[in-house]
């Protein structure tokens, strides 16, 4: 055992042992409690960054701790391998996306191995492998057969740079989430999965996720956006269809002075066909920003279509406007405008000098309608037969009236829209459908799956290369045998990441999407990833899990029992990025200090949920601590080996009750730290685990070894310390555990048990304050009387109370504090 800590040698030795023993390969064991720990699998960009290091170390620490508790632990890893960056690299560098992706995976896998993460590599999944996406295609066909998949023309979010459709969730402040380009509105034929059919369950089952952050659950509630309201029907002059309007405030119906439709509403297009100015307005809105945050602040613009609707109660005509603040994907793409009682409608009415009709009277307050809209509830006025009703009552009465007259109905509305999964790109899972002029849409037969991406394609940077590949497109219809075309769209990459966690459980299964192993391992017990996935990946995965449950593939209702959302890694107060020049290279960090130092720092520097501020001095401090632990262990190696031999031979018994007081006191501290650290591990508070380990080490390194019992105490304490540190710094703990003669490998050692008798103590440390200021400390017996404690306090604080009158002595038992009040 070298005197000097050499992390590279230590880490290579530990990793070779784990590889040789296949330490982290796991199988199902019904006699053990299972624990499935999973960090969101990475996109193979080519290199790990410090955010990766933090995220995957968090998962590894949890997995190793749960294993030490005796559970059957699965921690797999894989690659979310499809996506635009690979295709963009193909365009830029003239390299096939598959080749670029495989090269990146190899580089990142090497980095993961150097970090020492306890992965079951035999379960490694790469989503661009046909054996993976084959089952995604198979499942999509099952959903199609159930009526949960459909294709229709829809106005979509079009990214003009990436030349593809984006889901609503992929539009951030009006821009594409990857390219940053301003998103345009475009009508295109798209594939959808009916996530709205599961909206109620997706909402209600959030209540069962007790171990999810409240913020994430609220974000999903808001995104699903359930509201109870009324659908109102407006007949339109010289137009064949009624306009359907959804509102949560039917009590304001009598105050409607105009209607507004979205720029891509069929009525707007009808109006534009006969009105040049309307068409010009629609053209000017083509690049409209569609994020709700943008809508709240952008200029409200519109134009009168010249068409009118009939008020369903009064029969009066209302003008119909096209407005840029109405979105087709929310509600029906049309709104009832009540300027007196909706601020947005009021602003629009002021701009275009439209009527403002008050129909709600505020209760006990005055309101100036020349300044703003009154948006709260009140008493109805100017509402004919509904006058004098409270808003709460009027909502029901007016809804009933509309239902009786076939002019509306009570309804539940959702903000959530069906999931558009079509992407007009090459590097994704081919959608397994065939379009035949004779038969329409025909699924690819199961025996012809997977539909594999062709390799003989050209990457021009515009549109989908698949549309230009005749060998791929031109097929025979499996139903009628006539010439047909293969679907050239590929899946949104969120489809692959919506079920990968279940496939990890039964990697290698060639005859089914999932098998009974998925039922054993799911749900994932601990999932780790960023909060930015709250309304994309996490919602889609919950939806997919319910789809798989209803297909009989899994038993549970939810995919992830507990969720940990880690904070970002910052440097100089900013997120690390190449453009800011504040990136820390994990390879350099590991080469300089070792993986254990990197792991220790990212666990110690901040609680997991909070942002971590990078600190070079913090890294050096973590490294110094590990060097001290190594040096101490080396210094006492022979003694510790002898004690181990005694214990293994059955001669290592110590009666701790008979030990001297200083040993009892130190042992009390060690087991206090053990109890607290175990509690902190259970709460994922790893920063306080590390601080506890540092306190424990300081306690034993300062301890004077004088008796045989002292040696056993040091042995017991170093055993506890190494096991507490092992999930966080596994390499150094593995080597020290072996070199100090402990039984088995530390990866197989049980979690240390708290000796409750050690937590009991005969003595208590007290602090003495004089007029609230700390002046002294002393130790007293646990059964000392108040008089004895006060006398001891006066004695130890003598220099501060001499020549003063002690007016009062206050003992605070639970804080071990005595305050002397002097005059």
UniProtKB/Swiss-Prot annotation:
Biological processes, Gene Ontology terms: leucyl-tRNA aminoacylation
UniProt KW keywords: Aminoacyl-tRNA synthetase, ATP-binding, Cytoplasm, Ligase, Nucleotide-binding, Protein biosynthesis
Motif 'KMSKS' region positions after renumbering to this chain: 575-579
Residues that bind ATP: 578
Gene Ontology CC: cytosol
GO molecular function, one term: ATP binding
Keyword ATP-binding in annotation: yes
InterPro entries associated with the record: aa-tRNA-synth_I_CS (IPR001412), aa-tRNA-synth_Ia (IPR002300), Leu-tRNA-ligase (IPR002302), Leu_tRNA-synth_edit (IPR025709), M/V/L/I-tRNA-synth_anticd-bd (IPR013155), Methionyl/Leucyl_tRNA_Synth (IPR015413), Rossmann-like_a/b/a_fold (IPR014729), tRNAsynth_Ia_anticodon-bd (IPR009080)
Annotated localization: Cytoplasm
Pfam families associated with the record: Anticodon_1 (PF08264), tRNA-synt_1 (PF00133), tRNA-synt_1_2 (PF13603), tRNA-synt_1g (PF09334)
Locus of motif 'HIGH' region: 42-52
EC number(s) reported in the record: 6.1.1.4
HAMAP family, alphabetized: Leu_tRNA_synth_B
Family: Belongs to the class-I aminoacyl-tRNA synthetase family.
PANTHER family: LEUCINE--TRNA LIGASE, MITOCHONDRIAL, LEUCYL-TRNA SYNTHETASE
Name of the featured protein: Leucine--tRNA ligase
Species, as recorded: Legionella pneumophila (strain Paris)
């Amino acid at each position: 055992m070298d005197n000097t800590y050499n992390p590279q040698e230590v880490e290579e030795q530990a990793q070779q042992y784990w590889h040789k023993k296949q330490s982290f390969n796991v199988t199902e064991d019904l006699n053990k409690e299972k624990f499935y720990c999973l960090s969101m699998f990475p996109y193979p960009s080519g290199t790990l960054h410090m955010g990766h290091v933090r995220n995957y170390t968090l998962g590894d620490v949890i997995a190793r701790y749960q294993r030490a508790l005796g559970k059957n632990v699965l921690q797999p890893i894989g690659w979310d391998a499809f996506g635009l960056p690979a295709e963009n690299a193909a365009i830029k560098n003239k390299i096939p996306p598959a080749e670029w992706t495989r090269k990146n995976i190899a580089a990142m896998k090497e980095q993961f191995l150097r970090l020492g993460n306890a992965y079951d590599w035999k379960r490694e999944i790469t989503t661009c492998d046909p054996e993976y996406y084959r089952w995604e295609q198979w499942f999509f066909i099952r959903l199609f057969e159930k009526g949960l998949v459909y294709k229709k023309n829809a106005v979509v979010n079009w990214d003009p740079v990436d030349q593809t459709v984006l889901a609503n969730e992929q539009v951030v402040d009006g821009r594409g989430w990857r390219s940053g380009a301003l998103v345009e509105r475009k009508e295109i034929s798209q594939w959808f999965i009916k996530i709205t059919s599961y909206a109620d369950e997706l909402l209600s089952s959030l209540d069962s996720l007790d171990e999810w952050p409240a913020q994430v659950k609220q974000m999903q509630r808001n995104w699903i956006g359930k509201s109870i309201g009324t659908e109102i029907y407006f007949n339109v002059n010289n137009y064949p269809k009624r306009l359907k309007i959804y509102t949560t405030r039917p009590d304001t119906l009598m105050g409607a002075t105009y209607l507004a439709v979205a720029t891509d509403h069929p009525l707007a297009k009808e109006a534009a066909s006969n009105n040049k100015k309307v068409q010009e307005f629609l053209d000017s809105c083509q690049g409209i920003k569609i994020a709700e945050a943008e809508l709240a602040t952008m200029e409200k613009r519109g134009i009168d279509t010249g068409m009118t609707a009939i008020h369903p109660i009064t029969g009066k005509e209302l003008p119909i406007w096209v407005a840029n603040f109405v979105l087709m994907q929310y509600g029906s793409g049309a709104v009832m405008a009540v300027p007196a009682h909706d601020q947005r409608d009021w602003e629009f009415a002021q701009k275009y000098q439209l009527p403002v009709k008050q129909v709600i009277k505020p209760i006990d307050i005055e309101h100036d309608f020349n300044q703003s809209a009154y948006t709260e509830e009140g008493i109805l006025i100017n509402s004919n037969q509904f006058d004098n009703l409270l808003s709460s009552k009027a909502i029901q009465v007016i809804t009933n009236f509309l239902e009786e007259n076939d002019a509306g109905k009570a309804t539940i509305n959702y903000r959530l829209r069906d999931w558009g999964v079509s992407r007009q790109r090459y590097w994704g899972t081919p959608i397994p459908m065939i379009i035949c002029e004779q038969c329409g849409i025909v699924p690819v037969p199961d025996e012809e799956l997977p539909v594999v991406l062709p390799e003989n394609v050209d990457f021009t940077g515009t549109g989908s290369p698949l549309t230009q590949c005749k060998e791929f497109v031109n097929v025979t219809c499996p139903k009628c045998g006539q010439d047909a075309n293969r679907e050239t769209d590929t899946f949104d990459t969120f489809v692959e990441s919506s079920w990968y966690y279940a496939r990890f459980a039964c990697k290698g299964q060639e005859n089914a999407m999932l098998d009974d192993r998925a039922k054993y391992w799911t749900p994932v017990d601990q999932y780790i990833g960023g909060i930015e996935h709250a309304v994309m990946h996490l919602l889609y995965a919950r939806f997919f899990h319910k789809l798989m449950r209803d297909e009989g593939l899994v038993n549970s209702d939810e995919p992830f029992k507990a969720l940990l959302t880690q904070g970002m890694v910052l440097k100089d107060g900013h997120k690390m990025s190449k453009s800011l020049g504040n990136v820390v290279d994990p390879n350099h960090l590991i080469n300089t200090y070792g993986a254990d130092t990197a792991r220790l720092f990212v666990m110690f520097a901040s609680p997991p949920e909070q942002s971590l501020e990078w600190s070079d001095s913090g890294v050096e401090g973590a490294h110094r601590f590990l060097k001290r632990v190594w040096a101490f262990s080396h210094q006492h190696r022979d003694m510790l080996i002898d004690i181990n031999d005694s214990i293994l031979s059955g001669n290592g018994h110590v009666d701790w009750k008979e030990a001297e007081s200083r040993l009892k006191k130190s042992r009390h501290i060690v087991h206090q730290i053990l109890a607290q650290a175990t509690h902190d591990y259970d709460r994922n508070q790893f920063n306080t685990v590390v601080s506890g380990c540092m306190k424990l080490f300081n306690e034993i390194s300062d301890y004077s070894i004088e008796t045989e019992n002292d040696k056993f105490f040091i042995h017991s304490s170093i055993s506890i310390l190494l096991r507490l540190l092992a999930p966080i710094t596994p390499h150094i703990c593995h080597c020290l555990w072996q070199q100090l003669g402990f039984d088995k490998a530390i990866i197989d050692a049980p979690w240390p048990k708290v000796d409750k008798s050690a937590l009991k103590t005969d003595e208590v440390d007290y602090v003495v304050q004089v007029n609230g200021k700390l002046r002294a400390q002393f130790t007293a017996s646990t059964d000392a009387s108040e008089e004895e404690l006060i006398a001891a306090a006066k004695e130890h604080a003598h220099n501060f109370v001499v020549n003063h009158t002690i007016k009062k002595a206050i003992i605070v038992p639970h804080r071990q504090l005595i305050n002397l009040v002097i005059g």
